[in-house]
């Protein structure tokens, strides 16, 4: 792994190939050959996504002269990552492929990072921007931790498959993208008040991506392959913005902290992108921005715009708002040192989240 010799230098790692479109999965072998990969590939997938993509990937790789095997994974926990690493070592894998939703791809990221071998990202749903970023989510001691790894060597997004995923997943992905609005506002605030490093280019790419999804919200439809392509491209752009910045700052701010706090207090009440979308409404209000625009876009996209839609009690929302600043205390946001209970309730009620 590369170690930078000077503190002023920065290391930017981006995917070398992105193939997105209907039938893209069939190109996996050609992409691997083009990237000069060779030897054995280990496909990491879930029990449901194995039949959707995992087995087809292994077969396509075999047809192109690669050896390939499949390992089924479940929750992204340290023990599961260790199990996959051991499997990859025993198999003598030369590269990994994460195929499925966020869990399989996160495990592939972490295992590949620790084994110092490349990995490819093959999403089967457009539910979050982790499909392209160097950040991996890991469940540790009942909490979700963001772990820096490396960006995928390539992304193969078959929008024919992705468009057939449950509509809720794509709506959640849109919520994750729209949350870039407040993530950038938080980042700019940290730059002004804390002199935090800030990348104009990464911020511009992230903001443009969020704006594109909001502007195109009326034409993004479930089960529609062109819509899936739009959302996938936006998620990839968001992931690239994080790679350019060298952190998750362009796509993760106070709204993500709220989402993680909510999931800690009441686990499993909503998908990551859904919680981030709701958080974005509140955080945009706190920033003095157009929170109504965020709320309306989420509703048009079929994503929840209130806690009631996810059966989350009002008191849980208020508690999450008062605790959110503790999720990443080193990351300065509009939440500052925390909201009082009264301020949290007022923000949630004003924005009609509760």
From Swiss-Prot:
GO MF entry, a single one: glycerol-1-phosphate dehydrogenase (NADP+) activity
Entry's Gene Ontology cellular component terms: cytoplasm
Cofactors (names): Zn(2+)
UniProt xrefs under InterPro entries: G1P_dehydrogenase_arc, G1PDH, Glycerol_DH
Location within or outside the cell: Cytoplasm
Species in which this protein is naturally found: Methanothrix thermoacetophila (strain DSM 6194 / JCM 14653 / NBRC 101360 / PT) (Methanosaeta thermophila)
Binding-site residues for substrate, renumbered to this chain: 129, 176, 260
Binding residues annotated for Zn(2+), in chain numbering: 176, 256, 272
Keywords: Cytoplasm, Lipid biosynthesis, Lipid metabolism, Metal-binding, NAD, NADP, Oxidoreductase, Phospholipid biosynthesis, Phospholipid metabolism, Zinc
Entry's EC annotation: 1.1.1.261
Superkingdom, taxonomy of origin: Archaea
Pathway, per record: Membrane lipid metabolism; glycerophospholipid metabolism
Full protein name: Glycerol-1-phosphate dehydrogenase [NAD(P)+]
